[in-house]
Amino acid sequence: MPRPTKFRRVEFFPENNYFVPWGKPKCEIHEVVLKVEELEAMRLKDIEELNQEQCAEKMEISRQTFQNIIDSARKKVAIALTEGKAIKISGGHYTTKLCKLKCIDCEEIYEINYEQDRHLCPNCGSEKVICNKKADFCRRWCKGQNRKEQYEESKNK
């Protein structure tokens, strides 16, 4: 049985997460899904110009895992560009220091490990969780986890 996938640390999220070839009819568009950590690997290596070891440290993974991630990312982008496919940035196994959730029941504050614990508190298992920050990042990526009404409701009980 293989080991569970370790979550990769991600610091950047694009404002746009879908890119389509210009002038191609919608019915003819096929897409390539680029994981969030694959985009982060390309950003660190190709834009920030960090070496492989620095990139791996920032993402909190091994150098070999980093190399596998960036190879996969570059292959997907090359396929999309050469075959006229759309690029959708979505999914993956990642975590971030940018956003934390707070459990209303036990008041635990924790980092989000996407997709794993977006809706459940890891401490008590409650579904009553809200964003702990009101950052622009949260509005785009937490997808409605900042539920003020739910928080106010729980205080009134």
Swiss-Prot record:
Domain of life according to the entry: Bacteria
UniProt-listed Pfam families: DUF134 (PF02001)
Record's signal peptide: none
Family, per entry: Belongs to the UPF0251 family.
Annotated protein name in UniProt: UPF0251 protein CBO1373/CLC_1408
Organism, as annotated: Clostridium botulinum (strain Hall / ATCC 3502 / NCTC 13319 / Type A)
